Amino acid sequence: MAQPPYGQQPGYPGQQPGQPAMPADLPQHARERLTQMRQHHFFTSDLSVSEFLLVKEVGFHPLGLVMGSSIYHIGYQPIRGVSEELTTLTQALYQAREHAMVRMEEEADALGADGIVAVRLTVAIHNWGTNVIEFVAIGTAVTHEKAPGTWRAPNGKPFTSDLTGQDFWTLLHAGYRPLGFVMGNCVYYVAPQAPPGHPGYVPQNGELVGPTQALYDSRELAMERMQAEAEALNAQGIVGVTVSETNHTWGAAILEFSAVGTAVVASREDHQIPQPSLILSVNG
């Protein structure tokens, strides 16, 4: 996975012995916020009350709300009139998302986190220029209270997960652990079907083979790339997968398919799923 060229500075004001150095490319106010949280043992979180308590119940303590962003200008790629992947657009959107994720991980790393839970990846289209898109990654950095430093991903970075606090609790109780938030995408141009009067036009009911194959291929490419990221983490599977379709600003014929989920691995051999409890409402 491509990494943006980020540097590390040897220290920052208020750094305590044994604490990791604050990444040099983080904004000044972000460094100040993270430093204050570490010094005062103060945390922020976007977890709900129930999620917060469930995360605590499985031995993790929130360290702080972490985020990363990337504003990207999407380059131009000519369209040849046939259904095909637009690789320039695919790579641009993937890199923008990756930059946002890496910066969020850097903030978590600066807090000494083991991982990030409840990750949300959003996209915003601004009016600053043509084809300008911002990706924002937000989550809650956590550390294991009894064994800090032992829950990181195989690549040495904090694990990332888009699971809710409830799903995170269930996953750990069932004998699995998250490794990383994985994603794949594909931007595809879907060539229009033959218009009425064209030799290829079929007036009766029938499958539109060209568009069907184009959409099928684009989804499969996104899924395949997501799976490749999970395999690179030595994961056994991916949970919570969602596949979305977006036009962004390119028109109806150009679609981006993105697949995201949380790569997981077994943490023990027995996988006992907690039995659900029956709750009766006293409300009428």
Functional labels for PLM-detected ranges:
Residues A96-T150:
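Hydrophobic, ordered structural segments
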Residues A2-L89, V132-P211, T262-G284:
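Intrinsic disorder/low-complexity detector
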Residues R38, E51-F52, V102, I125-N127, ...:
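Residue-level detector of functional hotspots within protein domains
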Residues F43-E51, H99-A100, V119-R120, T160-Q166, ...:
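Short amphipathic alpha-helical surface micro-motifs
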Residues G115-N127, G237-W250, H271-L280:
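Short, conserved loop-to-beta-strand elements that form functional interface hotspots
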Residues V66, I71, I79-R120, V182, ...:
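Short, well-ordered alpha-helical segments
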